[in-house]
């Protein structure tokens, strides 16, 4: 999607656009319309089932707004490291929490909180501790990104069936609990 367009247009990168939710044909048609089909290769991949790439192939493995759905175990990050060249990077940008709720979900968030959110929305400290367990990487950046409010505002103006519920959730959240997390690790 947009991250593929950015990487191709800004950096001239060749991108393997691995997606679980959008068909390769749909992505290819989009890439062709955008004039990037010569640099963007759409593929269907479920990262939890293994990746169809050679070890040491990639300079960068990047996940925007998806890693939290599948990368919440120490084993997942460890399984990705071999695909990145020594000196290359693994980078993610994901929604998260300013602090762990544990069993103390704030009252205003309880109507929206569910088991998927409990599993996938974690704090920066939680993610840093998880990534620190991995062998073969050095964490070079981990922070709360300043674009959290902008990212949510853009999402809330999108046409998607769950946006209506998310609007209510974000009104209740009021900027108190959510953040957007960036993690970058260098493969050593």
Locate predicted features.
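Class I SAM-dependent methyltransferase SAM/SAH-binding core
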Residues: 1-49
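A short hydrophobic/small-residue beta-strand
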Residues: 15, 90-91
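A short acidic, Gly/Pro-enriched loop at the edge of an enzyme's catalytic core
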Residues: 49-61
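A short SAM/SAH-binding and catalytic strip from SAM-dependent methyltransferases
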Residues: 59-74
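A short glycine-rich, Lys/Arg-flanked "PGG" loop and its adjoining helix->strand segment in the class I
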Residues: 74-89
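Short, glycine-/aromatic-enriched active-site segment of Class I SAM-dependent methyltransferases
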Residues: 95-118
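Short alpha-helix
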Residues: 119-135
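Conserved Class I S-adenosyl-L-methionine
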Residues: 138-188
